[in-house]
């Protein structure tokens, strides 16, 4: 079984060659950066073969460090890049977006109020349409409001959407974290909506194997099936051991078959993002 992590961050410290936006958008998850080499060491120890690099918000819209990692380790990494929808040549960039080596799609985040308002004001209609037209998959961070993906899925039925961290409230845990589950399950009727089952231990109040979240994962499995669920860690933010995050999907969750585990732990993501599995 080839294990692919659907989300990690790598980044460098703020420096002249790789400046961060000022003031910083938020705080990095670790001091001193997290390099591709460090990521590989942690992946190897956890039994993870490949990972999708999602550049973090604090570096701005730059994908340079992530693309450098792909160039150095093409068998280990690919990228879902950040994208500046306000760039003067934004539409032209999209036309050749997937021509970049190792680039699989785009990750968009909706956290700050001005950005969230764009989901409703129509200012991103051109972006959704262009991504659909060019076959660019999107990862979306919607914190506790999965229903915000519904109008997009309705209007752009051929656009592939992946909802990060199960579209849960990242600052909550236990029962409070799962309050949006009914709304997330309701979106399963849209065949191009997929769910990233990432950072799962962060939403648990119990030690490994985090049995308090198993029922929620079963609901997602019943609604979406194993071909639309993608395991991930977000390792630099992860509570608990990276290896345990993998092992829970390999050894626990007794409703999963061996074929299900293979899909959720990498094959389904590889198919969705057109990142063929190779040994």
Go through the PLM ranges and name each one:
Residues 3-13, 163-166:
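Histidine-centered catalytic micro-motifs
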Residues 77-81, 160-166, 250:
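Short hydrophobic/aromatic-enriched beta-strand-loop microsegments
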Residues 50, 59-144, 151, 194-200:
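Active-site gating/metal-coordination segments in enzymes
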Residues 1-6, 16, 24-50, 218-219, ...:
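Mid-to-C-terminal alpha-helical segments outside catalytic/metal-binding sites
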Residues 7, 43, 66, 97, ...:
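Conserved, mostly hydrophobic/aromatic
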Residues 9, 57, 167, 200-201, ...:
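Catalytic metal-binding/acid-base residues of hydrolase active sites
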């Amino acid at each position: 079984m080839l294990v692919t992590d659907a989300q990690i961050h790598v980044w460098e410290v703020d420096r002249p060659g790789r400046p961060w936006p000022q003031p910083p958008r938020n705080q990095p998850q670790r001091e001193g950066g997290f390099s591709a080499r460090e990521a590989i060491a942690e992946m190897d120890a956890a039994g993870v073969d490949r990972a999708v690099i999602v550049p973090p918000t604090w570096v701005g819209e730059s994908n340079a460090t992530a693309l450098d990692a792909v160039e150095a380790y093409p068998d280990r990494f690919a990228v879902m890049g950040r994208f500046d929808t306000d760039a003067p040549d934004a539409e032209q960039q999209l036309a050749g977006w997937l021509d970049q080596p190792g680039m699989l799609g785009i990750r968009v985040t909706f956290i700050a109020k001005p950005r969230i308002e764009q989901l409703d004001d129509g200012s991103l209609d051109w972006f959704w349409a262009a991504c659909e037209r060019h076959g660019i998959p999107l990862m979306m961070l919607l914190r506790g409001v999965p229903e915000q993906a519904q109008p997009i899925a309705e209007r752009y039925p051929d656009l592939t959407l992946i909802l990060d961290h199960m579209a849960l409230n990242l600052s909550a845990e236990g029962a409070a974290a799962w309050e949006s589950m009914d709304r997330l399950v309701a979106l399963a009727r849209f065949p191009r909506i997929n769910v990233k089952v990432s950072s799962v231990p962060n939403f648990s109040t119990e030690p490994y194997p985090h049995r308090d979240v198993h029922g929620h994962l079963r609901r997602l499995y019943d609604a979406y099936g194993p071909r639309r669920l993608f395991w991930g860690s977000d390792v630099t933010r992860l509570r608990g051991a990276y290896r345990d995050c993998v092992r829970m999907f390999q050894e626990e969750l007794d409703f999963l078959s061996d074929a299900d585990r293979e899909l959720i732990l990498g094959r389904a993501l590889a198919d969705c993002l057109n990142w063929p599995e190779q040994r």
